[in-house]
Amino acid sequence: MAIVVSRSESGLSATTSFQSLDNLAGASVSSSFTVPTNVSSIKSLSIALACDGAGEEFCGLVKISGNAMRDGDAVFATGGQMTMGTSTGSNMNFVQYDTDLAVQPGNSCEFSIATTTNAAIDVVVTAQFA
């Protein structure tokens, strides 16, 4: 059976520097989590990203880091965002990656995000372990 871990941010003032994701919906949680026992890899990564569409154009980068990552940090593109043309527009995307990132059970891991241009975003990252 697969195990999933998710982290999110709402209204994050994202910048070109990586920021840890330390929420799960409305709850504040630790950005770092322990890789579950009896798993050996991250099999998929899902990223949902949205902005208000009022003039923000950027690409996002999600990083998985920590001493659980056997081959070092992994960075994934979130997909690009662009202006929708009105202040009431919306912009969102979803990407999913099939991966085989080796992890060390019992060690720690975290998700963080950076953007190519500063932007106010909502983001959810989910990793599936097996």
What residue spans do the PLM features occupy?
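Short, surface-exposed beta-strand/strand-loop-strand elements in extracellular ectodomains
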Residues: 55-72, 125
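C-terminal interaction-tip segments
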Residues: 1-28, 32, 36-38, 52, ...
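Solvent-exposed serine/threonine-rich low-complexity stretches and specific carbohydrate-binding patches
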Residues: 8-14, 20, 72-87
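Tight coil/turn sites that cap or link beta-strands
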Residues: 26, 38, 87, 106-108
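Short amphipathic, basic-aromatic surface patches that mediate peripheral association
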Residues: 47-53
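Extended extracellular/luminal ectodomain segments enriched in beta-structured repeat modules
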Residues: 37-45
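Beta-sandwich interaction modules
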Residues: 87-105
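Noncatalytic modules at the cell exterior or secretory-pathway interfaces
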Residues: 47, 100-117
